[in-house]
C-alpha cells in the first residue's frame, strides 16, 4: 500500500498557478485614480497652452568629473539586492543538494496504479496528522480499578483469539487501538474488561475482515461468560464513545512503508513485526505514535541482524532520526529480554512467532545477544 508521489507539491502548485513569462509577466500597476481621467481633455488642454518654449541647448563645455581610481585587488561594491539574490541562490542550491542525496523510492512505481505513487506522500502526511488526532495518553489508567497487569493479560488472550480465528494482522492492531482509546475515555470495572476486549475485536473484524466472525462466535470464545446481547450492547457504547472514528493509522501501515524505503528483506520485516507485536502488551508504550513504533522496530531489527544504522533516506521518509527512536528501541529491547529469559508469563506473541510460518523469528540467537541486553539495561541505568 506504499509509494511516494512522483510529482512534488511544488510542481503541482506550479501546474495550477503557472508563472507568466515575457512581456505579460507583470501587469503595469496603475496609480490610484490615474486611469479614470479624461485623456482627450488633457490633450486639448495641452494644445491650448501652445508650443512650449525651446530650452537653450547646454554648452558643450562640460565640467570635468573626478575619476575614482580603484586598485585591481579592491572588490566591486555589491548592492543589497544583489547580495540578497546571491543568498537565495545559495539556499536553493543547498536544498537541491539535499534532495539529490535522498533517493525517490517510488519513481519506478508510476506504471502501478495500485501503489498510488502520485499521492503517496500526501497519504502518509495525512496519516501522520490522523495519528496525532487519535492519540492515546500516557498512563491513562491511573486511578482505575483495572491495572496494567490486567490489560496485559487481556491483550495476551486476544492474541490467542486472533490466531484461533485466523484473522488479518491489521485486525489485531486495530483491536488493541480500540481497546485503549475506549478505556481512556470510559473506565470500566474489572468484571467488564474482557467484555470490552472481545467487543473491540468484533468491531475491528467488521472494519477489516471480509468475512468477520459472528457475535455468537465471540460469545462462545469467552466460554459464554457474556451473552450476545451484552456484546452488541457494548458495541454500541464503544462506537458512540469513539464517535464512530475507527480509521486510526496502524503501525503495520508505517512498517510496510519503512521496509520499502530500506529495501528490507523478509527476515528484517518479520523481526520488526515481532518487535511491534510485543509492544501491544506493554502499557508503558501505548502513547507512542504508530509511526514512531514502526520506525523504531525496523531500526532495531536491522541493527540486530546486520548492524545497519538508520540511513538518511529512512530518516527523511519516516521523519524521525535515530536519536529520537532510541528510547523506543530500549523499551522494545526490554520486552524482548523479558520474553526470551522467561521473566513474564505472557508468551502468546513469542509462541506465535516461533512457528516456521513466521520464520521462527522469536527464536533467533540475535534476540539473546549482548546488543539487545545492553540496550535493555540502559533503561535501568540511564
Curated annotation (Swiss-Prot):
Skewed-composition ranges (Polar residues): 1-12
Classification via PROSITE patterns: CYCLINS (PS00292)
Keyword list, A-Z: Cell cycle, Cell division, Cyclin, Mitosis
Record flagged with keyword Oxidoreductase: no
Annotated SMART domains: CYCLIN, Cyclin_C
The keyword Cell division belongs to this UniProt entry's keyword annotation: yes
Region span, Disordered: 1-78
GO molecular function ontology, one term from the record: cyclin-dependent protein serine/threonine kinase regulator activity
CDD domains: CYCLIN_CCNB1-like_rpt1 (cd20507), CYCLIN_CCNB2_rpt2 (cd20570)
Gene Ontology biological process terms, A to Z: cell division; mitotic cell cycle phase transition
Pfam families membership: Cyclin_C, Cyclin_N
Biased composition (Low complexity): 38-47
Assembly information from the UniProt record: Interacts with the CDK1 protein kinase to form a serine/threonine kinase holoenzyme complex also known as maturation promoting factor (MPF). The cyclin subunit imparts substrate specificity to the complex.
Protein family membership: Belongs to the cyclin family. Cyclin AB subfamily.
Function: Essential for the control of the cell cycle at the G2/M (mitosis) transition.
UniProt name for this protein: G2/mitotic-specific cyclin-B2
Organism encoding this protein: Oryzias javanicus (Javanese ricefish)
Name of encoding gene: ccnb2
Amino acid at each position: 500500500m506504499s509509494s511516494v508521489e512522483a510529482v512534488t507539491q511544488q510542481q503541482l502548485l506550479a501546474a495550477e498557478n503557472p508563472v507568466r513569462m515575457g512581456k505579460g509577466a507583470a501587469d503595469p500597476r496603475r496609480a490610484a485614480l490615474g486611469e479614470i481621467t479624461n485623456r482627450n481633455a488633457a490633450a486639448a488642454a495641452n494644445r491650448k497652452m501652445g508650443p512650449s518654449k525651446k530650452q537653450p541647448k547646454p554648452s558643450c563645455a562640460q565640467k570635468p568629473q573626478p575619476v575614482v581610481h580603484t586598485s585591481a585587488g579592491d572588490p566591486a561594491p555589491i548592492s543589497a539586492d544583489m547580495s540578497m539574490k546571491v543568498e537565495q541562490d545559495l539556499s536553493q542550491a543547498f536544498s537541491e543538494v539535499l534532495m539529490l542525496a535522498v533517493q525517490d523510492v517510488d519513481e519506478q512505481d508510476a506504471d502501478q496504479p495500485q501503489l498510488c505513487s502520485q499521492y503517496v506522500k500526501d497519504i502518509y502526511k495525512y496519516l501522520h496528522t490522523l495519528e496525532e488526532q487519535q492519540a492515546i495518553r500516557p498512563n491513562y489508567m491511573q486511578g482505575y480499578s483495572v491495572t496494567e497487569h490486567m490489560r496485559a493479560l487481556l491483550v495476551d488472550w486476544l492474541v490467542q483469539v486472533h490466531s484461533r480465528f485466523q484473522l488479518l494482522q491489521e485486525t489485531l492492531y486495530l483491536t488493541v487501538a480500540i481497546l485503549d482509546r475506549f478505556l481512556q475515555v470510559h473506565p470500566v470495572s474489572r468484571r467488564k474488561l474482557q467484555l470490552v476486549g472481545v467487543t473491540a475485536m468484533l468491531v475491528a473484524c467488521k472494519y477489516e475482515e471480509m468475512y468477520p466472525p459472528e457475535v455468537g462466535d465471540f460469545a462462545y470464545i469467552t466460554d459464554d461468560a457474556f451473552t450476545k446481547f451484552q456484546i452488541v450492547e457494548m458495541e454500541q457504547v464503544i462506537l458512540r464513545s469513539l464517535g464512530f472514528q475507527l480509521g486510526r493509522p496502524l503501525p503495520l501501515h508505517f512498517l510496510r512503508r519503512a521496509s520499502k524505503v530500506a529495501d528490507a528483506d523478509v527476515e528484517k520485516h518479520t523481526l520488526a513485526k515481532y518487535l511491534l507485536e510485543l509492544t501491544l502488551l506493554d502499557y508503558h508504550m501505548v502513547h507512542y505514535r504508530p509511526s514512531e513504533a514502526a520506525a523504531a522496530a525496523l531500526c532495531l531489527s536491522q541493527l540486530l541482524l546486520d548492524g545497519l544504522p538508520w540511513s538518511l533516506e529512512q530518516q527523511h521518509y519516516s521523519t524521525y532520526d535515530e536519536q529520537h527512536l532510541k528510547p523506543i528501541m530500549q523499551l522494545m529491547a526490554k520486552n524482548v529480554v523479558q520474553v526470551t529469559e522467561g521473566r513474564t508469563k505472557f508468551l502468546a506473541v513469542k509462541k506465535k512467532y516461533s512457528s516456521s510460518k513466521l520464520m521462527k523469528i522469536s527464536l533467533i540467537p540475535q534476540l539473546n545477544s549482548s546488543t539487545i541486553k545492553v540496550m535493555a539495561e540502559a533503561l535501568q541505568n540511564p
